[in-house]
């Protein structure tokens, strides 16, 4: 799956998610992480000019992801429910289904308080700050969170995680953008 991420073959992720039997799978948390990534991808694609036909799929994927997050709420690692629901609100905002920017940021911040050493949570919050409008975030602030996440990504369990690679990419992008400020 990491190779598919590197090659930007997101249809591989879609096929994996679609073929997984979420309700009975021991890999529910892994599938949820892929759904989180795929939703971000498909929402971004649907917003591109000439790709409006993807909008129904994007909306359906976000709702499906939201239902999985809600169903697993009590079983998710500390801070992950808040992280994933924050992402849902961002996706819905991008799809113009509802406006939740403050609720999204609030949940992302809450996730960092609940799980201050969880690299997924820290990286997600960095992503929120990276894309947030000036009053709510900055590349400089995002970089701090990405670098903090990177410290916790150092174990073997994260070696092949797509979020770790995305985190490293964001560190580079932040440093590049800050160089020109």
Feature-to-residue mapping (PLM):
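Short coil/turn connectors between adjacent alpha-helices in alpha-solenoid helical repeat scaffolds
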Residues: 2-8, 41-61, 90-101, 132-143, ...
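Start-of-domain marker
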Residues: 1-36
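Amphipathic alpha-helical repeat scaffolds of TPR domains
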Residues: 23-47, 77-95, 117-131, 159-178
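Short, basic, low-complexity termini and linkers enriched in Ser/Thr/Gly/Pro
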Residues: 22-29, 53-56, 67-70
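Canonical positions in the second alpha-helix
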Residues: 19, 72, 110-111, 149
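TPR/TPR-like (Sel1-like) alpha-helical repeat modules
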Residues: 102-106, 130, 136-157
């Amino acid at each position: 799956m990491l190779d598919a991420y590197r090659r930007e073959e997101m249809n591989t992720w879609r096929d994996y998610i679609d073929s997984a039997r979420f309700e009975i799978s021991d890999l529910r948390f892994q599938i949820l992480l892929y759904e989180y990534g795929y939703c971000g991808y498909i929402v971004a694609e649907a917003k591109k000019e000439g790709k409006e036909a993807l909008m129904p799929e994007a909306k359906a994927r976000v709702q499906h992801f939201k239902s999985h997050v809600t169903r697993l709420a009590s079983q998710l690692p500390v801070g992950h429910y808040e992280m994933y629901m924050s992402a849902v609100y961002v996706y819905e905002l991008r799809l113009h289904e509802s406006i939740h920017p403050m609720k999204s940021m609030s949940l992302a911040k809450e996730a960092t308080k609940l799980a201050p050493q969880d690299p997924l949570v820290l990286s997600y919050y960095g992503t929120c700050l990276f894309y947030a409008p000036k009053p709510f975030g900055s590349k400089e602030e995002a970089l701090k969170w990405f670098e903090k996440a990177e410290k916790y990504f150092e174990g073997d369990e994260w070696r092949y995680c797509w979020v770790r690679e995305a985190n490293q990419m964001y560190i580079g992008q932040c440093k590049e953008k800050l160089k020109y400020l």
